[in-house]
């Protein structure tokens, strides 16, 4: 609908017609009309309440109920319309609005089965909900705004053939960053809590910036510890082949030479290598004097801070836009003392965990604290915990054995009889190996795997074997469990397959140290076992692996802490709920 439509005329010639004006700042030039009580006859006769026509096409459908009646009835009515009579021109409907006067929500017209979970309240920029129909109409339905929503903020999921409309906080974030890009050369960042759809927001920003002639290149940077394969899959869901993942620094440079590649997704580390290596200087020099935008995913990561100065030298006109669910403040500053604001300057929009829980976009947490050391030690006292926080105590055979027994005892109840699954994060590779071997002794029917990165040279962390050998053992067990043929030489493929198995609940428990604790989304993951000390952003990021919305069978994310104490949890929640 947004592109030119070819129409064959009576004389056989072809004319191209623009059905909808999508040009910047020309949205208001579309023609708007309102019609009431349109009757459509399909399998049954249905009468639609209010239809907004734009250039003669029914693009917005509004269904109303009387005050006091649950407005979900209007949603159910839309479902009936789609089944029985919403055809012909009404297939062009982009947005549905439902209201009982007091509560009002909007949602996209999807070919997929509709779910009330994906209906949204509109808000102001400060996340204050606009419930009342009159106020909603004043804010959401002005000609320019509704046209902009349809032309800019609808996204087609090419994989699932699903039409999506962006949520208000996503809209405001992109609008603010676009304004920042077009009107200034200054940096900025967005603080949207984990699980709130930052990938979609950053994709839309990348897409819109890439169409601007003033922007020579958009780089989307992720950390190699995160699931860059997951990110690229999501990007290409939203627009097929919009972005290619760079496999090496040479591939990155080749893409930078290709002027048709306006969006390049790569890792922070590959970009850092490109900037360091003199042999790539001639390609990087091509961007001198040109406006380049770097969009940094999970920008609280210290790695970007370390390479920021180098990139700044190589790309003097670059702007940096960061996305994070857990910014760095003075309390959790990076090792060099810098905060997120020190690098990215201005916070242009926030949507906090308390907002997301209130809106039903993510779940809350149910946290258990399990004493595993000594009843004479006050687990709430940080100083005493530090005093006993030694490898010898924490790696004690009996302690590990007791925790494994406890996990096996509670796992079925925590995961709703294995409808869901769990990640078990521990403090070190030696501890992970010890847990893996302890689980294996039990001959449990739980499907358990382990994953970690190994170093080429190690300082005798393990007395009996190099960690790579231990990982090789785990992969061998995994191969037998799932009839695969991975090894440490094909670690990337193993990593990808483990990711899929967790998402599909084919694994019951995945043992990790740091992997999978940031950027990994799996709706069927509902439990996190924690035998390490977490705080601040690391705590919120790890806990948030469990809080993706699924069904009523998943009311919250389960957290079972064997070291992290209540004060650390309370402090982290307070810090990121300001």
Regions found by a protein language model. Name each.
Residues 512, 516-541, 557-561:
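A short beta-strand element within the Helicase C-terminal
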Residues 193-194, 298-301, 314-333, 360:
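Conserved helicase ATPase motor motifs in RecA-like P-loop NTPase domains
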Residues 332-421, 436-445:
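Interdomain helical connector at the RecA1-RecA2 junction of SF1/SF2 helicase-like NTPases
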Residues 391-512:
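Conserved C-terminal RecA-like helicase domain
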Residues 80-84, 301-319, 546:
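Short, conserved "post-DEAD/DEAH" coupling segment immediately C-terminal to helicase motif II
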Residues 1-217, 226-242, 259-262, 269, ...:
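ATP-dependent helicase/translocase motor core
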Residues 545-576:
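Conserved segment of the helicase C-terminal RecA-like domain
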Residues 263-296, 301-310, 493-499, 512-514:
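Conserved RecA-like ASCE ATPase "motif II neighborhood" in helicase/translocase motors
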